[in-house]
């Protein structure tokens, strides 16, 4: 029996000028995803994906590296300006925004889209260290 050679579709380089940078900064990690205006993913990165483990993932430096990686990958698709949507209380919020700006992408607007409960579920108990 002859083996059939299956050809995988190569990732098509889109040429998109403007997009949205979604920064999800949790207490444990920071995820940066750059999408087009419709919400289709162009590039993403996270502190954990870059090799940071444990408590190092939650540092501002890890968030900066994740944002740089996502910005570089999105520039290959032609992204020149982004609107930033920040979600979560993590420590990597500001450093991720600065890293995107330093990578040469123009930031047109910054929105805080952190979900606020209208008295939903009970929050976790306070840590006693």
Curated annotation (Swiss-Prot):
Molecular function per GO: rRNA binding; structural constituent of ribosome
Swiss-Prot/TrEMBL keywords: Ribonucleoprotein, Ribosomal protein, RNA-binding, rRNA-binding
**SUPFAM superfamilies assigned to the protein according to its UniProt record, in alphabetical order:** Translational machinery components
* Annotated Gene Ontology cellular component terms: ribonucleoprotein complex; ribosome
**Superkingdom, according to UniProt?**
Bacteria
What GO biological process terms does the UniProt entry carry, in alphabetical order? Answer: translation
- Pfam families per UniProt: Ribosomal_S11
Question: Which protein family is it in?
Answer: Belongs to the universal ribosomal protein uS11 family.
In terms of HAMAP family, this protein maps to: Ribosomal_uS11
Please give the function described in this protein's UniProt entry.
Located on the platform of the 30S subunit, it bridges several disparate RNA helices of the 16S rRNA. Forms part of the Shine-Dalgarno cleft in the 70S ribosome.
User: Subunit structure, per the record?
Assistant: Part of the 30S ribosomal subunit. Interacts with proteins S7 and S18. Binds to IF-3.
- Name of the molecule in the record: Small ribosomal subunit protein uS11
Q: What organism, scientifically named, is this protein from?
A: Levilactobacillus brevis (strain ATCC 367 / BCRC 12310 / CIP 105137 / JCM 1170 / LMG 11437 / NCIMB 947 / NCTC 947) (Lactobacillus brevis)
């Amino acid at each position: 029996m002859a083996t059939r050679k299956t050809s995988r579709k190569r990732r098509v380089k889109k040429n998109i000028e403007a997009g949205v940078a979604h920064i999800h900064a949790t207490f444990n990690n920071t995820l940066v995803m750059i999408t087009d205006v419709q919400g289709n993913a162009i590039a993403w990165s996270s502190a954990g994906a870059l090799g940071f483990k444990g408590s190092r993932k939650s540092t501002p430096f890890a968030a900066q590296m994740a944002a740089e990686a996502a910005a570089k990958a999105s520039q290959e698709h032609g992204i020149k300006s982004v609107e930033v949507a920040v979600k979560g209380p993590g420590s990597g919020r500001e450093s991720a925004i600065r890293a995107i700006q330093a990578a040469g992408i123009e930031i047109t607007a910054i929105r805080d889209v952190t979900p606020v409960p209208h008295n939903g579920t009970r929050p976790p108990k306070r840590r006693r260290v």
